[in-house]
Amino acid sequence: MEEIGIILPEKDDQVTDAKGLPFAGPQTFDELESEDLYTKYKKLQRMLEFLEVQEEYIKDEQRNLKKEYLHAQEEVKRIQSVPLVIGQFLEAVDQNTGIVGSTTGSNYYVRILSTIDRELLKPSASVALHKHSNALVDVLPPEADSSISMLQADEKPDVQYSDIGGMDTQKQEIREAVELPLTHVELYRQIGIEPPRGVLMYGPPGCGKTMLANAVAHHTTAAFIRVVGSEFVQKYLGEGPRMVRDVFRLAKENSPAIIFIDEIDAIATKRFDAQTGADREVQRILLELLNQMDGFDQTTNVKVIMATNRADTLDPALLRPGRLDRKIEFPLPDRRQKRLIFSTITAKMNLSEEVDLEEFVARPDRVSGADINAICQEAGMNAVRENRYIVLPKDFEKGYKNNIKKDESEYEFYK
């Protein structure tokens, strides 16, 4: 190589560039890779610092939002704190406002709290209103503002059919109309007929109408709702019809159920040209009752029993078939019925062998089952008064005179 003028450096000689500096030569692959990793490391480190700053910022925001949330919760609790005004939701205007009716009879255009579930705001729903602004702050459960309650299992009357003397026909008719459709509905389906929807029990006072209804409540597992007709007559307009709706709503929710309305003549008398607001309100209650009885079908398993002393005063629309299909009369007991009632009531009494109940049964006075029970109770009290453990015939005689043989002059005060 020297011959052609090229001198190769020795191995120990250092290669320099044009400036005389040592020449590094091309970088290896490992060196390039380490430089890329270092750059990535720096980028990740800067990103980590940025995320740490963001984390601190988010934590501060979270603490502030939590404080605002707790403050808002306290504000909602303060708004919903009692005492609140109970009202009735009538209509929704938009998502934030609606129309409600108060217990005073006035309607208000109010604001609806944003935390309230709009699905619960249905017409006739019970709501809570703020006492100052009347804003709608809560939706109450259906049973909260209802004066109608259902008898629980331990509250049902302890009256059995065997405790009622006589009335075999009435017992059979009410069991066919009320008990059988609830327990053996397939019998009516096989025959192809519909069971009665409602039953009317009518007759003079003291003939066992309410007692027989209590026996039905005792012997059936269905829910039993008992109300008196006068309970529907309330002070404010619209309260009576709302109570009627509550009764049937409660019965449908707990079906199979039995509704027993005692003294139905308080709200179901024949309609006339009412001149006062009270009479018109009673007629509205009757119309709501008729509407509810038409509104439920046989699949709901709801039966209605009504009792009255004055069937002649009831509105014909209530008595028509389809509403009250079966009408059961409770007349004053005849001689056979008297004997059965006396035997049933005195079965647990300690009677003397000289007592002849047939003597009192044969008397021509028209007495009711309640009168016979009063006679036996008075006879027992006479024995207690004389410190005896046995009831004698004279005790029954005194009891009979005290309850049946009344001088008409004693009732002049009531004439």
Swiss-Prot record:
Database matches in InterPro entries: 26S_Proteasome_ATPase, AAA+_ATPase, AAA_lid_3, ATPase_AAA_core, ATPase_AAA_CS, NA-bd_OB-fold, P-loop_NTPase, Prot_ATP_ID_OB_2nd
PROSITE patterns xref list: AAA (PS00674)
Subcellular location: Cytoplasm; Nucleus
GO cellular component term of the entry, any: nucleus
Top-rank taxon: Eukaryota
Leader sequence segment: none
Residues bound to ATP: 203-210
Family: Belongs to the AAA ATPase family.
Name of this protein: 26S proteasome regulatory subunit 6B
Organism: Manduca sexta (Tobacco hawkmoth)
Source species taxonomy: Eukaryota, Metazoa, Ecdysozoa, Arthropoda, Hexapoda
